[in-house]
Amino acid sequence: MKVGFIGLGKMGAGICSNIVKNGIDVVVYDINPANVQKFVDMGASSAATVKELAAQVEVCITCVPMPKDAKGVLLGPDGVFENLPEGGVHFDLSTLDIETVVMLEAEAAKRGKKY
């Protein structure tokens, strides 16, 4: 199984680090190239875009700081929901309000994805 991880800040880095250390095949993406390089050095592969990452994984984990950031990586033609393969699962570990969570779950469901 290949896992995608988007958001390698303080929280995301700690979580993703444990996944990589346990030998899981991980593809990473972050807006900060230095954060990505740290995980490439640990054995993860990287994606140049969210779309590229989502298209090649079965499980996608996001861990971003704000609702606007979550919407930015999940929605739209280049987002996770449009590009995660059929049957793909998304786990959101982001800091979100309940209204955003409910909206994102509905958007995922429209596309046959699990949120």
Model regions and ranges:
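NAD(P)+-binding Rossmann beta1-loop-alpha1 motif at the extreme N-terminus of oxidoreductases
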Residues: 1-62, 88
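Alpha-helical scaffolding segments of alpha/beta enzyme cores, especially the outer helices
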Residues: 52, 79, 103-106
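Short gly/ser/thr-rich secondary-structure transition/capping motifs
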Residues: 41-47, 71-75, 113-114
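Short, well-ordered alpha-helices that flank and scaffold nucleotide-derived cofactor binding pockets
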Residues: 17, 21, 75, 106
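Residue-level signature of catalytic and energy-coupling elements of molecular machines
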Residues: 4, 70, 91
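Rossmann-fold NAD(P)-binding glycine/threonine-rich loop
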Residues: 89, 94-115
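Beta-loop-alpha module in the N-terminal Rossmann-like domain of NAD(P)-dependent dehydrogenases
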Residues: 62-78, 94-102
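Short, conserved loop/helix-junction motifs that constitute active-site signature segments
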Residues: 80-86
